[in-house]
Amino acid sequence: MGGYLLLGAFLGCGVVFSEALLRSRCGLIRLWFGLVIGLIMMMWSPIPFAFAMRFTRAAQLCGLALSAAIAAGSALIMRGKARYRGVFQGDMPVWMLLCLLIPLAILSGYLQYTHTLREIDGALHVGQSTYGDINMHTGIATHLRNAAFPPDYPILKGARLGYPFLGDSMITSMLLFGADMAVSFRITGTLMMVLVGFGFVAFAWEMTKKPLAVVVAFLLLFVNGGLGFIYTMDGESFREIFTGFYKTPTNMPEYNLRWVNVICDMFIPQRTFLTGWTVLLPAVYLLLLAVREKKRRLFISLGLWAGLMPMIHTHSFLGLGLVSAGVMLQALIGSSDRRKTLINFLLYGGVAVLMAIPQLLIWTVPQTVEGSTMLLRFNWVNNNGDGTLIDNYFWFWIKNVGPVYLLLIPAALCQKRRSPARGFMLGALLLYVVAECVVFQKNIYDNNKLFYVAFMVCLPAVGALLADAIDAIGRIRSLGAKAACAAVMGVFCAICLLSGSLSIGREIASDYVLFSESEAAAGQFIDTETAEDAVFLTGEQHNCVPSALAGRDLVCGSPTFLSYHGLNYAVQHADRRAMLENPAENAALFEKYGVDYAYISNYERGKYAVGEAWFAEHGTLVFESGSVRIYALS
């Protein structure tokens, strides 16, 4: 219970802070910013204290006290000043907001429940999209309990954790006060999805002021998908969408379809992406307000906000920066006072960079630069690796993104010359070009996290273009012509949304056992009966019980995670095999890594010629269930 109260306390601090500083904005905007600020406080405020006292309950309480002091101080300073009292500012329709956010909240809540360690008869179940990534996030969340700072990876002993971990550390904060891990992931995940949904509605409304444009843009973002459905037209392929593992029309690598649905394959499984967008949408909204209102305090506030983003989600931070560069260029072109405009943007960028540098130097640079994960590569996953393309350049993007791709340039050209939308689309173009030419991680696929930011900021303009087209159809006098145009528009929208809808349907139906009853019991035993700094010798499975369910250190984890994170694990990988297969001859390695336990299951027995007789003779069998055995070695 204490963990949920802690979350509520931080959210309350954020709302109080927002109520004080955003007094000129409507109630819903203040609430949105307040809840996001509360999450940021929960992620960031314990960190300075963790360097001094580890990531303990004391650090969380100190962080909460700091957040409460900031909130109370801002409320006192702004006391008595006028406040906008309306729930809505302007004429945003209530029906539009409810019709968009309620289904999103229900869908998100359901998927968070079914996809996050759902217990059935003692086993832990997940969905298709979380079968892989959830192991990394639960491992980090459990590993950070009482950890020294800066922390290390749980899956590679001694390697500094360079992955943006703050979205997982908020779960750690809740765990330290007794919250259930699965419930904590579900509550915060659903909350963040709703905040992302509202944030996009607010941004699209400010850009267009057209309800139909907002609805269209919202659907194109959250039900996104390309032309993959054409590969599922026969009965067998269509059935496989709902029964096969990753046979959805938005994620078919065999057909070079990699533009996945953002709900199914990004927001639900990739918690860092979801947390990043939770913080990104208010930043984009602030950027729009700053350009429109030309107030210096908005630019400085935006700089402070952006400066907190790198360790929340580095891709979102980079995406915001490149989009902002395009917005700045457009603002300078149309400004009557270019000096003031330039100073405003320099203040914004300067504050953000100064705050980001320590984060980048401590965490990001050692992993990205020293790990040699940056490289030049044209056209994302459509590149064979030798400079040649798998598909024709434009066909690749059309079949992945769908017909929406063809509307991006017309939508930009239809904007007024000094419209902020042009600046955002110029920024999207800059981001698109960079993401098309530079890969920032060994997992080339991860550049989609940049493409999605570019896609998102373009959608309000695309929605406005389609809304204008629909309005024009309504004004046609000839019934025949009107019917024909309406049919064309209907087919167009169906093509845009069909692949995404099928993918969401598959995700709703998916159910996989991630940890068997014996493995779940082993995880519970490890979590409660072994020391938090215990080191485990295991196989290389991605769903490794000691790390995923208890956050314990491993000699070496899954190559899938380690390679994509740019970590050099060759020595540890070889040493693991030597210790598992020839433990009698490798006593020095056990001492080198400080191995406390050996975790032996059917996976280890199938992957390695495990010298289990040696472990049974020289270790102590402390846990046995089904095929799982845990031997204490020290």
Stretch-by-stretch model annotation:
Residues 1-92:
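Membrane-embedded, hydrophobic transmembrane alpha-helices
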Residues 58-120, 211-215, 634:
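Start-transfer (signal-anchor) and selected internal transmembrane alpha helices
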Residues 83, 87-93, 290-298, 334-347, ...:
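Membrane-interface helix-loop-helix junctions at transmembrane boundaries of multi-pass membrane enzymes
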Residues 104-279, 314-318, 512-513, 540:
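Active-site lumenal/periplasmic loops and adjacent helix-entry segments of GT-C-fold
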Residues 190-193, 273, 318-321, 443-471:
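Hydrophobic/aromatic-rich transmembrane helices and adjacent perimembrane loops
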Residues 264-265, 298-314:
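Membrane-interface alpha helices of multi-pass inner-membrane proteins
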Residues 281-290, 323-334, 400-422, 468:
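Hydrophobic, aromatic-rich transmembrane alpha-helices
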Residues 474-634:
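Extracytoplasmic
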